[in-house]
């Protein structure tokens, strides 16, 4: 069994914000798997699905971004899952907009949701699907930038990026992060 976590903030006011791209990917992954977020546990919405041969719980923590790790840590402990069973999808300021990258470990890069997950699972050594949102304009607070909504004209690019992130997540679940990284990151570099 695997746990896929899309990071974001609950509430309609955060829909379509850069910081909620993890929720968007989780929603699309569940939709493609024919699953729905019908379970509520660990202060999170959960959808049970199958990705290839793997049973997967897709999670959207409802704790707000900075406390996402509480839900993730509780779920890992309850299901007795290891870090190799965890895939976290989140926005990333350090990647160009719409670029998708899969990595294992590394720092949180100032992302408070990732920082919280690291603290509550005891390590950064889990798979992360990073979805690039780019840097804010000069003199703009990064918090205001990530809480800003994607522009209407960005729909096509965002949809394509979400599909790439869903595919990266699926590969990480089915192949394991190490094997999946070669495919995902090669495609991401080729798209530049």
Swiss-Prot record:
Highest taxon in the source lineage: Bacteria
Keywords on record: Cytoplasm, Hydrolase, RNA-binding, tRNA-binding
Keyword tRNA-binding in annotation: yes
Entry GO MF terms: peptidyl-tRNA hydrolase activity; tRNA binding
Catalytic residues (positions): 19 (proton acceptor)
Coiled coil: none
Top-tier EC class: hydrolase
Location (main, coarse): cytoplasm
Catalyses which reaction(s): an N-acyl-L-alpha-aminoacyl-tRNA + H2O = an N-acyl-L-amino acid + a tRNA + H(+)
Record note on quaternary structure: Monomer.
Family, similarity comment: Belongs to the PTH family.
Protein name per the record: Peptidyl-tRNA hydrolase
Organism: Anaeromyxobacter sp. (strain K)
Classification lineage: Bacteria, Pseudomonadati, Myxococcota, Myxococcia, Myxococcales
